[in-house]
Amino acid sequence: MLDREGFRPNVGIILLNARNEVFWGKRLREHSWQFPQGGIKYGETPMQAMYRELHEETGLHPEHVKIIGRTRDWLRYEVPDKFIKREVRGHYRGQKQIWFLLRMVGRDCDICLRATDHPEFDAWRWNEYWVPLDAVIEFKRDVYQLALTELSRFLRRPAQRAEKPRGPRPLRYPRIGGAPAQQTLTIVDTSVVCSEIEVEARTLDEMPPRVIIGK
């Protein structure tokens, strides 16, 4: 289902924990990370599509989250031709998205990346709100920045507010999985029900793979 300009209606999800950290999913068998997202089916509202995609990609149900806010209008990104199927080239241009900001009220162990037979992610983690977007595929970075910026006004204030970076450097936190930077990560060991392990790692690639693989 495309609009007149060739954009597919879509929803994006920024999922927060109690520390204002955001959920990142690692795309299946790839090295890129992203937020949950997916197309709006015919007859669905954006909210209905959001709850469906949330469950399909993270295993969470409506009772596990609280809606904090959403973008006022559609945010668009174009997809390069090399990522578009040949049969729809010339018609399909990209995605137009409504973004939702959710607060997780469930537990980390409620997240299940294999809630369907066709998982989108094979690992996940919590990350700082204003993290550099180096690990996001390039053509999505601008719309991610727009969504994060617009929805940041809904973050808790003042004690847990995630401050917007200033100056010429757009973002200031350690990379998701790039340049060496000592950081403390809170991730889930899926072999232990509802328990969290603090792991010291310089980069995401140095983590024990079994620890970050989703259940």
UniProtKB/Swiss-Prot annotation:
This is RNA pyrophosphohydrolase. The gene is rppH. Its EC number is 3.6.1.-. NCBIfam families: PRK00714.1-2 (NF001935), PRK00714.1-4 (NF001937), PRK00714.1-5 (NF001938). Accelerates the degradation of transcripts by removing pyrophosphate from the 5'-end of triphosphorylated RNA, leading to a more labile monophosphorylated state that can stimulate subsequent ribonuclease cleavage. Keywords: Hydrolase. CDD domains: NUDIX_Ap4A_hydrolase_plant_like (cd03671). The keyword Hydrolase applies. GO terms for molecular function: pyrophosphatase activity. Gene3D superfamilies: Nucleoside Triphosphate Pyrophosphohydrolase (3.90.79.10). It holds the Pfam family NUDIX. Residues 6-149 form the Nudix hydrolase domain. Belongs to the Nudix hydrolase family. RppH subfamily. A motif (Nudix box) lies at residues 38-59. Its cofactor is a divalent metal cation.
